[in-house]
A protein has these predicted regions:
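Positively charged, aromatic-enriched nucleic acid-contacting surfaces
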Residues: 35-179
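N-terminal, Lys/Arg- and Ser/Thr-rich interaction peptides
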Residues: 1-26
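Alpha-helix initiation/capping motif
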Residues: 7-9, 32, 136
Length: 181
């Protein structure tokens, strides 16, 4: 079973941390659980996938099952992959369930390319930092992937006040490829 790569519109960006002395920010790429649901729906249709939650040793797990038999016409072979989640700071139980689901989907290959993302640093002149905090809205402008690996990425800061869209671009990265591959 092969799932497509994420599009730039499906990837969200958040500030992971502000660098000491407000010198810049470190950004993190992530996806919402709805993205996983949409990709499952479009790839195997809602009829041929399901999820189930269970608890083991006080830890919440989610398992995602896909009816791989539907691909061959037998309709009786379900394959399940699972993982646990961690609580979020906002809604602990909902966040834990969502995280477990996203991790189980990762085990199917959905969004796996996010784990190959480069270190994303944005200097202070490309963002608004005040008292050690940054609330700017960052967006993936473009992403290029090859074999579930990110090889090109650009991010824009929608909070920068400028008339020129190119001036909003705050991070550009292209993977250097050696002669050996």
């Amino acid at each position: 079973m092969k799932f497509r790569d994420l599009t730039s519109e499906e990837i969200e960006v958040r500030v992971q941390s502000v660098v000491k002395n407000d010198k810049g920010v470190i950004l993190l790429l992530y996806k919402d659980a709805r993205v996983d649901q949409n990709i499952l729906d479009e790839t195997v249709t809602p009829k041929y996938w399901q999820k189930d939650y269970y608890e083991a040793n006080g830890i919440l797990f989610c398992k995602v099952g896909i009816n791989v038999g539907a691909l061959t016409g037998t309709y009786d072979t379900w394959v399940w992959k699972s993982d646990c989640g961690s609580e979020s700071n906002i809604e602990a139980q909902k966040g834990e369930a969502s995280d477990a689901f996203k991790r189980a989907c990762f085990n199917w290959g959905i969004g796996r390319e996010l784990y190959t993302a480069p270190f994303v640093y944005v200097p202070a002149d490309k963002c608004n930092i005040s008292n050690g905090k940054c609330f700017d809205k960052f967006v993936v402008e473009r992403i290029k992937t090859v074999n579930k690996h990110i090889v090109g990425l650009s991010i824009v800061n929608m909070s920068l006040k400028t008339d020129n869209p190119k001036d909003k671009r705050c991070f550009v990265w292209k993977k250097e490829v050696s002669d050996n591959g």
